[in-house]
Amino acid sequence: MSSYLFTSESVSEGHPDKVADQISDAVLDAILVQDPRARVACETMVKTGVAIIAGEITTSAWVDLEALTRKVIVDIGYNSSDVGFDGATCGVLNLIGKQSPDINQGVDRKKAEEQGAGDQGLMFGYATNETDSYMPAAIHISHRLVEQQAKIRKKSNSPLPWLRPDAKAQITLRYEDGVASAIDAVVLSTQHDPGIKQKDLVEAVREEILKPVLPSKWLHKGTKFHINPTGKFVIGGPVGDCGLTGRKIIVDTYGGSARHGGGAFSGKDPSKVDRSASYAVRYVAKNVVAAGLADRCEVQVSYAIGVAEPISISVTTFGTGKVPDDKIEKLIRQHFDLRPYGIIKMLDLIHPIYQPSASYGHFGRKPREFAYTNSNGGRVVATAFSWEKIDKAEVLRADAKLK
């Protein structure tokens, strides 16, 4: 029997890189409400006392960038100089320019379905049946831990009133013959007020954050727990570390369980295939696994700038496929339109759906409908995390002729 360990990590919404991601996606969402045809590539940097917003945006929309940036920072929990960063008083610097017309001529077409890719690149999508979310277990649990930290921190009359926004979690899983069997180690570091004693912090974090999340079936006597192992984490957030958009691409995706093409997501409108195609191939891989065609599936797609059709589509099921990989590839080509316009239409991506994805992972989330008011005063219904639907699983299974 083969045995090995695998580790993934996640970070909280208060981590400086995630603060930057959320600001970038908040800007994107605010623009899409007013201008669905906008081209947005918004980058953010946060450091002590300042948020810098830069990038290339072409739009007819007007957004109060300063007010929006401050709101995101305050909503996360950075609302006082006591915690090291105050969204109400920090400086906000706007360095946004327009998207190059050279890119526009490669993307925009008279016929929408001929829309070219906004850049060259390669993207990967992945799914596994080891969790209900079709995500690798280590990253799934890591996300839930930092999500629980924020939930407890923001709770009225919180049992842990000394929690601060910055936090990180890490899970090490033991696999036996390729199947997750036990949690070998748990690491959780959370920013805190200076008055809390380490012993009290460890006990409270175990009870309020770890216990509600960790699957008891995978815990054992040998599971190692490292809670704030340095003994002190008072200075955090943008004071402790400079935060930049797009620096947590492994946290955003599969925790290292699958390959990554290198492109970040936040702040990019869906004409950028770095984002939209990554969402599409997650949708593809998840439906392949949900259909029972494989236990694990990784799909790669690649593009050339200005060209609509993908340059390549490839499938790997790591020996878990119930049908050959080349047959799965043919089914993918038959049932999924992976041209940029096809992806946008298939997943209904031109809506303000992106800020929630900027923390706790872009994948493994539950699709949810919500309504918003567009610039004309009309009510619009959209679906956040539409790429997590498994609405193609049944037809894939039928066409694969699996019983």
Curated annotation (Swiss-Prot):
Chain sites annotated for binding ATP: 15, 166-168, 232-233, 241, 247-248, 264, 268
GO cellular component: cytoplasm
Residue numbers binding L-methionine: 56, 99, 241, 272
Catalytic activity: L-methionine + ATP + H2O = S-adenosyl-L-methionine + phosphate + diphosphate
UniProt keyword terms in alphabetical order: ATP-binding, Cytoplasm, Magnesium, Metal-binding, Nucleotide-binding, One-carbon metabolism, Potassium, Transferase
Region annotation (Flexible loop) ranges: 99-109
One Pfam family recorded for the sequence: S-AdoMet_synt_M
Cofactor(s) this protein cannot do without: Mg(2+); K(+)
Gene Ontology annotations of biological process type: one-carbon metabolic process; S-adenosylmethionine biosynthetic process
Pathway entry: Amino-acid biosynthesis; S-adenosyl-L-methionine biosynthesis; S-adenosyl-L-methionine from L-methionine: step 1/1
Matching CDD domains: S-AdoMet_synt
Residues noted as binding Mg(2+) in the record, renumbered to the chain: 17
Binding residue positions for K(+): 43
Keyword rRNA-binding: no
Subcellular location: Cytoplasm
Assembly and oligomerization: Homotetramer; dimer of dimers.
NCBIfam families reported for this sequence: metK
Family to which this protein belongs: Belongs to the AdoMet synthase family.
Entry function: Catalyzes the formation of S-adenosylmethionine (AdoMet) from methionine and ATP. The overall synthetic reaction is composed of two sequential steps, AdoMet formation and the subsequent tripolyphosphate hydrolysis which occurs prior to release of AdoMet from the enzyme.
Name of the molecule in the record: S-adenosylmethionine synthase
Species this protein is from: Xylella fastidiosa (strain M12)
